[in-house]
Amino acid sequence: MLKLSTNEIRKKWIEFFESKDHLFIEPKSLIPKNDPTLLWINSGVSTLKDYFSGKVKPPHKRLVNSQKAIRTNDIFNVGLTSRHHTFFEMLGNFSIGDYFKKEAIDWAYEFLINVLKIDVKKLWVTVFEDDQFTNDEWIKLGIIKEQIIKCNRDRNFWDVGNGPCGPCTEIHYDRGERFDPNKIGSKLILEDIENDRYVEIWNIVFSQFNNDGHNNYTELLQKNIDTGAGLERIACISQDVPTNFDSDVFMRITKSVEQFSEYKYDMNEYFHPNVTQNKINFAYKVIADHMRATVFAIADGAIPSNKERGYILRRLIRRTMVLVRRLNINNLLWVDAVVDAIASTMGDFYTYLKDEKTLTKIKMILNKEVQLFEKTLQLGLNIFENSIRNQELDKEITFKLVDTYGFPIELIKEICEQRNVKVDLEAFDAMFKHHQLISKANKANLKVMESQNESLMQLDVDSTFHYEIFRWENAKIITLFNEDFELVDGLDHEDGYVVFDNTCFYATSGGQQHDTGYIIKNDQQFFVDDVFKAPNRQHVHHVKNASLSMNEHVILQINEQDRKSITANHTAEHLLHYCLKHVLSPDIKQEGAAKYPHKVTFDFTYHAQPTKAQLDKLENVLNEMVQSNFDVQELHMDLDEAKAVGAAAYFEDVYKKLKGKLRVIKMGPSIELCGGTHAHHTSEIERIKIVECASKGAGSWRITMVTGHDNLAKYIHDLYVDYLNEINHLKVNLDINDHKLNDLYNAFANWKNLSIDDYDLLNEKFAELKQSLINFKIEFDKQNAKQAIIDIKNTFNTQLTNKRVHVFKNTDNKNIFNALNELINENQDTLFISFNLDDNKIQYLLAINEKFATTNQINLNKYIKELNTISNGKGGGKPYFVQGGTSEQEKLDELLTVVDKWVINA
């Protein structure tokens, strides 16, 4: 077999199939376009699905590609096996209604034998047991008959349950006995046992049937070919190296990391296993793999965050950092070095990796994320150090480190192993799963009903929503459900769900909150507190304590003021989106938005937090657009027409599913597809104030705006009241004798004629007053603490023995701690023991002079263990200073009795 670089193999693949009249398709972004079923492009065919489904006409019936992909379902196998990756390249050749089995098989053989010069005796193939044609074709070409394995449906039939499907044939390469240490031989491939000897390098799927969803199969009129060959696998066998991670692409990355570590990678460890070297190799493999995925993902527009693909990216980076620590790399220079190595190795094909602007962006985002986690890591490590009890890490602390500080669980395991600390991973796992269940339950809402409730799925009645109407006089009840979504004929003073033939209630969608209001029947009013869309688009109204019957006619009245506020906020959100892209950066990507009566929030990704100056400029431009009094136009067109006129379709996959013309909202330069309610003119918004721009995680931001004179007046008043309450809370129990501080407080507390124009000044004065109070309180507490320490010392100094014990009640343990620290330096041979009764707990401290303890071989851990045993408590510390506690306050007398028996001998 020819020894080829990864780049050479890819080039030969593309050129070979181009010679067979295939059109080369450039690799697409890892972020799927308009495919909500995927977080990442995860196969070579993922980007071609619309061609195979017939939604889009392919540019040619024969296609070839080398598509980058990410899969994270096997993340914990990366580095443990020879071939698992998160990022990989899939070589593919495809026929869309053109050639079929014969050509696909013949060309696969030709490429492997004539181009790569593989010895035919090294090839083994699997075929579907009923696919005689494929079996015979392989024999005709020269594959040894005994090396063709007939397999059942589970192994060699591609079927997703509904839609195109068919048999497949897999090509395996025999790497020889050195990759079969147990000398199992052909049984490995015959019985499909995971192994490194027989490596699958190519899979050809013959899409020739349609499954109707009930396993009834019919021949497709248009038969297709879908193939996939793993580039990294072919490179591994071509270069004759033990694992994919030893091939040229990975080794360049590994070498870039090695320069910063005293630990070196050794590919010979595969044949000569060594536990220590295996851990080192594992670290290098995972770093190389995860960094490839990270660099390409960021280049394609992904940003680390706490949700969806951003969360996966963050997880990959943090897992990498754990293993960088294992290699004892203590600086951050490795980040840029790895990015440069990946760009150098793969930039000839992925040319954008050599673009200076792209490289700078990747390095900036990556370094920022690494530095962010470094800080979090240090905070978490401090918690870890302070939480170890009896060489054991509590499951609650483990959970906190994972959930709050983002520690990968493998980092906790590694630190615990290094410190010889026990950690109950099973208890943590159970707790984590319980937390996930609670989180899911808390997030469960009517959207779950929409997708899973059978009654709603089968609801097939005509119901019309009227955008511009606030009151509908003659709405007919056409469907009634009780609280359990069971169809009923009536509700009798109970909660339930109602569908009308016509409604003016907006249903929650597109981030816009539903209307609230009343169903009016004669002289009765029933409150509607929620409205959502059923799967078939009807508006379903949740009503409280209602008495209603099927086919009754009622009046519907929404909360008009709330609707007008939401409408203004939704219109303002469109303007904000436009301004962000034109004032801040065209790279802004919307993550979500929420429109309420009192505010609007807008979530977006951007590599840096917008500055105060940028936000001020943004606000000024927004208000200029409001004052421009643009007409808000409602247009109707199909998706292609909308895109042709420049309409932004930020959730295009949703719009593709809708039938008929789509609703397009245009106001001045802003034009978007949207199903929400809007003002008629931008001047109806009155005024926009950006009140917050907060981080939602690295690279993810949320802008909050308030609009309209009345809402702004209420907002500034409520903000002032909140600030004043916080200030008054800080002042409690403070005897302020500082005139300047009193003047500052009085000026704030008696602020008159406050308006939204005072927003920045209010924040400034609040921050100044709050900090002044905090500083005063710190000094106040410091003085109190000094006196408390003196009082505690005096309490102990009334005793003249070399063992002094005292029971405190509701005393600050920190003051006791500091008092004992001073006492053991002033009393060289005395043991001090304190018990502090606080909140149904006992906290105990034992302290003795360090030098005295060392000289006399005293270890207070022996004494505190005795207290822990009696009271079922926990605690420990240094030989001369230990602390612990118990929730069993009733054990105090027993503790005092045992302490009384202790003898301290010099």
From Swiss-Prot:
Gene3D superfamilies attached to this UniProt entry: 2.40.30.130, 3.10.310.40, 3.30.54.20, Bira Bifunctional Protein, Domain 2, Threonyl-trna Synthetase, Chain A, domain 2
Keyword Aminoacyl-tRNA synthetase included in the entry's annotation: yes
Gene: alaS
SMART domains documented for this protein: tRNA_SAD
Function: Catalyzes the attachment of alanine to tRNA(Ala) in a two-step reaction: alanine is first activated by ATP to form Ala-AMP and then transferred to the acceptor end of tRNA(Ala). Also edits incorrectly charged Ser-tRNA(Ala) and Gly-tRNA(Ala) via its editing domain.
Predominant cellular place of this UniProt entry's protein: cytoplasm
Enzyme Commission number(s): 6.1.1.7
Gene Ontology terms describing biological process: alanyl-tRNA aminoacylation
Designated name of the protein: Alanine--tRNA ligase
Listed SUPFAM superfamilies: Class II aaRS and biotin synthetases (SSF55681), Putative anticodon-binding domain of alanyl-tRNA synthetase (AlaRS) (SSF101353), ThrRS/AlaRS common domain (SSF55186), Translation proteins (SSF50447)
Catalytic activity reported: tRNA(Ala) + L-alanine + ATP = L-alanyl-tRNA(Ala) + AMP + diphosphate
Cofactor (UniProt): Zn(2+)
UniProt xrefs under PROSITE patterns: AA_TRNA_LIGASE_II_ALA (PS50860)
PANTHER family the record matches: ALANINE--TRNA LIGASE, CYTOPLASMIC (PTHR11777:SF9), ALANYL-TRNA SYNTHETASE (PTHR11777)
Source organism superkingdom: Bacteria
Cofactor note: Binds 1 zinc ion per subunit.
Pfam families: DHHA1 (PF02272), tRNA-synt_2c (PF01411), tRNA_SAD (PF07973)
Binding site for Zn(2+): H570, H574, C674, H678
Family annotation (NCBIfam families): alaS (TIGR00344)
Domain notes: Consists of three domains; the N-terminal catalytic domain, the editing domain and the C-terminal C-Ala domain. The editing domain removes incorrectly charged amino acids, while the C-Ala domain, along with tRNA(Ala), serves as a bridge to cooperatively bring together the editing and aminoacylation centers thus stimulating deacylation of misacylated tRNAs.
Protein keywords: Aminoacyl-tRNA synthetase, ATP-binding, Cytoplasm, Ligase, Metal-binding, Nucleotide-binding, Protein biosynthesis, RNA-binding, tRNA-binding, Zinc
One GO CC annotation: cytosol
